[in-house]
Amino acid sequence: MNKNFYDSNVGAITKYTNVFGEELFILPCIAGTYAIGAINKDCRLRNMSLAVLQSFVYAEVASAGLKVLTCRTRPSDSNIQHPTSDIPKWQGPFATFESTSFPSGHAMRSFAVATTVAGFYPEKTWVGIVSYSMAALCSAGRVVSEEHWTSDVIVGAALGYFIGRGVVKFNNKIGNISSVDIQAIATNYGLGFVINF
């Protein structure tokens, strides 16, 4: 197969599948679904949107923390491809902020979101199928485009899944998250928050 033909087609496909793990795609989708839920007075859709935001934030923090602690080089790094390269694939904690391969943030975010969405609509099988398919396409695209090693994507997807499951379980426990009341309190001793649910 012609490498240029393969690279150009894979690049075109992964450009569209990577978007499912992008912050600039996920955050407007969360805002949009919350707005639709508010306009239609759909409490479950509003709750799901807030839970997806929780999952997104947890996945983002976990991904950033692990990337800084592992400092793994990406497969697309031209230096790592050279057989005589002195650059190790794992550089260790805080070695560099340029080696951010492990884990895949796209996979973690997309699976955290997919798991949360599917968890709020367990009776609608198609919701889970569509959500997990989008997450899987995003994750596979990261490997195919040589942005991540396969292990980066597998670990990112697994962590995203468990983050999403945890958020769904927590939200099922507290019930209607949109009824949560958060108040800021300012005193002479400092600032604080009170959360009532």
Enumerate the predicted regions with their spans.
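Topogenic and prosegment regions of secretory-pathway hydrolases and membrane enzymes
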Residues: M1-N18, G37, K41, V68, ...
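N-terminal transmembrane-helix/juxtamembrane module of multi-pass inner/ER membrane proteins
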Residues: M1-T33, V68-D86, P93
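Alpha-helical transmembrane segments of integral membrane proteins
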Residues: L24, P28-A31, M48-A51, S55, ...
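Hydrophobic alpha-helical transmembrane segments of multipass integral membrane proteins
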Residues: L27, A31, Y58-A62, S110-V113, ...
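Interfacial segments of alpha-helical transmembrane regions
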Residues: I36-A62, L66, G128
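Short helix-capping/hinge motifs at transmembrane helix termini and TM-loop junctions
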Residues: N40-K41, T70-C71, P122, E146
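Membrane-embedded catalytic cores of phosphoryl/pyrophosphoryl-handling enzymes
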Residues: I80-N196
